[in-house]
Curated annotation (Swiss-Prot):
A Pfam family matched in the record: Trp_halogenase
Catalytic activity: 2,4,6-trihydroxyphenylhexan-1-one + FADH2 + chloride + O2 = (3-chloro-2,4,6-trihydroxyphenyl)hexan-1-one + FAD + 2 H2O + H(+); (3-chloro-2,4,6-trihydroxyphenyl)hexan-1-one + FADH2 + chloride + O2 = (3,5-dichloro-2,4,6-trihydroxyphenyl)hexan-1-one + FAD + 2 H2O
Amino acids binding chloride: T352, G353
Organism of origin: Dictyostelium discoideum (Social amoeba)
Protein name: Flavin-dependent halogenase chlA
Length: 603
């Protein structure tokens, strides 16, 4: 076997899945001069024609991740042409656990309108194959091989990577038939670990945290199938009360200690990813470790989904008996980082996986701009700031799953939880992303300083829901899509754009008035707290110390951010909302239309 064929690259990305390929494309789009200077190492072949190699959980994007793919990766038209649209997240609880034959047997929150920002359902096999072709065309160097060793991860010296190059196999042949051809050594100044659960860097640096004590008690697992050509009429719920599809959404079906996703993978053909995320204190992995057991579970607990799968053809079956993990370090001072599943995964609920990837990749690119231009101080400033920021963002996404085991199956408790958690996402995270605040080290410092305070407030709200759940208190059913439940027509998913960022096209860095969004987010969260505590404790809420602590927290934050919003508005005087449209208006002043001066042509 040949060994030691050495090549050097500025950046090596370990892993050619959606995280690694998205990072590669983003880096090459923002810094085209990196063509030929980025390598991708992946054990799957460049051909990618074997489904057994490419099984994935169907990935549902939300507004943040959709904007990342459409704008940052410049894939808007590609997504429209190749992947199903996504209109919303929809949630369904059985009216009676023993009767789940049709959708009318559920209490549901349905999307009521088309989304403000178009999201997509991603067929992971398809998009990874297409992204691979794109990045190779952009100048990335692809190595079909497996990483065997990495040196110098504990210092900032140049890294050395031992790679086992693999053979191609016949089209459609078993992935495991690949043979080792040779061993080569690659060197690089920076490593991006996107190797997923192989944890190429994490396993060599003691960076992975899997114990539930590091995950807010989260101990979950997952089982799923892909199915094609299902019967359309089984989930063809029609209504004259809305203006959008109820099929091209991520539908969530709930039960005690578990929830099930239903994600369309193709347009028109009714192909789905259908899987369960469950908590191991309620269901053991041994109870769902085969297709027969999974189907038996659905037949007794979610008959509608059982019938849907039985009507089609099962493509594959997969399971993860241990789902959640996180990392100690995300961006290291030793010139490596972890992204995607190699960094953290908690639960597919709320479709947060690609949101984390989007922020990780944008921070990575921003950081490496300074490293590659030899601006050492600016680079190290961002390594520290972005590592703290991403750690806080992942902790928030982890905390979103805290106590799910006890809440998921209760339609009253969980609908309330979805209601206020949707408010936080739409009023805080989405505007911050639109305004690109996450790329500012100063914002990162402020965000991370306030992080523990935010988690403490959430803990108080979860404790209130725990009390209602343990005492079987019906606190009503909240629909996160509709207005008219809190104050006027306000709703978490439709009333978030307090600064009119979409209509004014405030997409530039910090053009959007984020303090204004934070201010009004806390105002409505204060109202949510008042209504929630009254539903749980009645008039006794006035004697509840937790109520006053929570309300004083949000009231103070409302006042604080209201003042900062006025300061932001003052500082933006004279700055256009959008440079592109401002330039059009200025250029148009010289426009002069002459209807008699048609340009001649040959005829």
């Amino acid at each position: 076997m040949d060994t030691n064929i050495i090549n050097h690259y500025d950046i090596i990305i370990i892993g050619g899945g959606i995280a690694g390929l998205s990072a590669t494309r983003h880096l090459l789009l923002k810094m085209p001069e990196l063509s030929g200077r980025i390598a991708v190492i992946e054990p799957r072949s460049e051909r990618r024609d074997n489904l057994d190699e490419d099984y994935k959980v169907g990935e549902s994007t939300v507004e943040v991740s959709a904007m990342f793919f459409a704008k940052e990766l410049e894939l808007q038209d590609y997504l429209i042409e190749n992947h199903p649209p996504k209109f919303s997240l929809q949630f369904h609880w059985p009216r009676e656990l023993s009767k789940t034959d049709t959708i009318e047997d559920y209490y549901s929150t349905w999307a009521v309108k088309n989304p403000d920002i178009q999201a997509f359902q991603l067929n992971r096999c398809k998009i990874e194959r297409d992204l691979l072709k794109m990045v190779i065309a952009q100048g990335a160097v692809y190595y079909h091989g497996r990483v065997r060793n990495v040196d110098n991860l504990d210092n900032d010296d140049m890294k050395s990577i031992d790679v086992e190059i693999l053979s191609e196999v016949e089209s459609g042949a078993d992935f495991k038939l690949q043979q080792s051809i040779e061993r080569i050594t690659l060197t690089t100044d920076y490593i991006v670990d996107a190797s997923g659960r192989n944890f190429t860097v994490g396993s060599r640096t003691d960076n992975i945290l899997k114990d539930p004590k590091h995950l807010f008690g989260l101990d979950n697992a997952s089982t799923w199938v892909r199915v094609k050509n299902t019967e359309r009429s089984l989930f063809d719920f029609k209504s004259q009360d809305v203006t959008c599809s109820w099929t091209y959404d991520t539908n969530h079906f709930f039960g005690p200690g578990y929830w099930i996703w239903m994600i369309p993978l193709e347009r028109g053909s009714r192909d789905y990813s259908i899987g369960v995320s469950y908590h191991r204190d309620k269901i053991q992995p041994s109870q769902l470790n085969s297709l027969d057991k999974f189907m038996s579970f659905l037949e007794k607990n979610q008959k509608l989904l059982y019938n849907l799968i039985k009507s089609g053809e099962i493509v594959d079956f997969h399971r993860w008996p241990k789902l959640a993990h996180t990392s100690k370090t995300f961006f290291s001072k030793n010139n490596w980082c972890v992204i995607g599943d190699a960094a953290a995964i908690f639960d597919p609920f709320y479709s947060t996986g690609m949101v984390m990837i989007a922020m990780e990749i944008e921070c990575l690119t921003e950081m490496l701009k300074f490293k590659l231009s030899n601006a050492a101080n600016d680079y190290h400033r961002r390594v520290e700031a972005f590592d703290k920021l991403i750690r806080c963002v992942t902790q928030i996404n982890n905390h979103l799953i805290k106590d799910h085991s006890n809440h998921l199956g209760n339609a009253s408790i969980m609908s309330w939880r979805i209601y206020f958690e949707s408010s936080t996402y739409f009023s805080i995270l989405l505007p911050a992303y639109i305004g690109k605040y996450h790329l500012c080290p100063i914002f990162s410092d402020h965000f991370t300083t306030d992080h523990e305070n935010g988690l403490a407030l959430r803990n108080q709200l979860l404790a209130t829901l725990d009390y209602a759940n343990e005492n079987s208190i019906n606190i009503g059913f909240m629909d996160n899509h509709r207005g008219g439940q809190l104050l006027g027509d306000w709703s978490p998913t439709s009333s978030w754009d307090y600064d009119h960022a979409l209509s004014l096209a405030k997409y530039g860095h910090k053009r959007l008035n984020l303090p204004k969004c934070l201010s009004w987010s806390n105002f409505y969260l204060s109202l949510i707290i008042c209504k929630l505590y009254y539903r749980v404790y009645g008039i006794g809420a006035l004697w509840n110390s937790s109520f006053f602590k929570s309300l004083s927290n949000t009231t103070y934050r409302f006042s604080k951010f209201y003042f900062l919003s006025k300061l932001h508005s003052f500082n933006m005087i004279g700055t256009p909302n959008n440079d592109y449209y401002d330039k059009i208006q200025k250029d148009f002043k010289s426009y002069n239309y002459n209807q008699n001066n048609i340009v001649d042509w040959k005829y």
